[in-house]
């Protein structure tokens, strides 16, 4: 019997890359995919679908329970709402998640198999079924130095990173690109005039940035187009951003 694998969040930033990768590596040949949607239940499933041609409601616990494995890139809010309900309903399948929500739970394993494959194998043999993707900075960092840690050659390390806006997800990316379009439209006439003063263009761009509405900055909370912000997650109130905390806590858990 073919393994029934539910996919949630497959249209977002992370999910789109995953779909491309699974298609290129012919992973869909090995499974029966069941596609879920939080906004378009009843719509047509993508081309990778086989027998399950209709999008299912991603909040329908009974439909989710059909799956042997669920892969979700829908984000932390979805995991927070659905995962406990699904487990409480008696589902014991494998939950594979890109979000950070479950990473530090005792019954979850952060997946970075080139570094912690023995941990993964041990958890699988013991009946583990919560497999969580790690923070991107942590994963890239440990891929580079994991072997040095295993050899006992590293006492401590420090890492610095710029977070990409895409780390917030597809809606954050849409907001950023829309802001760029808004700023361009504000000064397009001046840009088209080779005699226009660059300082006047600069002033108009800044003024437009500062006047963006709450709706235009709903995801990031502030104008990001043409600017920088300290983080895209949150301030923990102790001098650390959540991203910095992940760099320490997740690294130690993986190791």
Kindly label every feature range from the protein language model:
Residues 1-218:
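N-terminal Rossmann-like NAD(P) cofactor-binding subdomain of oxidoreductases
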Residues 208-255:
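Oxyanion-binding "anion nests"
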């Amino acid at each position: 019997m073919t393994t029934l694998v539910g996919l949630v969040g497959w249209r977002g930033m992370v999910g789109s890359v995953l779909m491309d990768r699974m298609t290129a590596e012919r992973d869909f040949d090995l499974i029966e995919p069941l596609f879920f949607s939080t906004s378009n239940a009843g719509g047509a499933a993508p081309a990778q679908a086989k027998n399950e041609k209709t999008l299912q409601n991603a909040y329908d616990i009974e439909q989710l329970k059909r799956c042997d494995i669920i892969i979700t890139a829908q984000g932390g809010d979805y995991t927070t709402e659905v995962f406990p309900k699904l487990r409480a309903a008696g589902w014991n399948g494998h939950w594979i998640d890109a979000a950070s929500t479950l990473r530090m739970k005792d019954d979850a394993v952060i997946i970075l198999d080139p570094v912690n494959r023995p941990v993964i194998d041990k958890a699988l043999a013991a009946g583990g079924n919560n497999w969580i993707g790690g923070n991107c900075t942590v994963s890239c960092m440990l891929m580079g130095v994991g072997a040095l840690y295993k050899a006992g050659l590293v006492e401590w390390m420090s890492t610095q990173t710029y977070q990409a806006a895409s780390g917030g997800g597809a809606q954050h990316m849409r907001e950023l690109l829309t802001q760029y379009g808004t700023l361009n439209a504000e000064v397009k006439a001046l840009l088209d005039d080779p005699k226009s003063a660059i300082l006047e263009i600069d002033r108009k761009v800044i003024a437009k940035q500062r006047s963006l509405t709450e709706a235009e900055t709903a995801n990031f909370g502030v104008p990001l187009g043409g600017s920088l912000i300290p983080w895209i997650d949150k301030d923990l109130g102790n001098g650390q951003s959540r991203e910095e905390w992940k760099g320490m806590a997740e690294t130690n858990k993986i190791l």
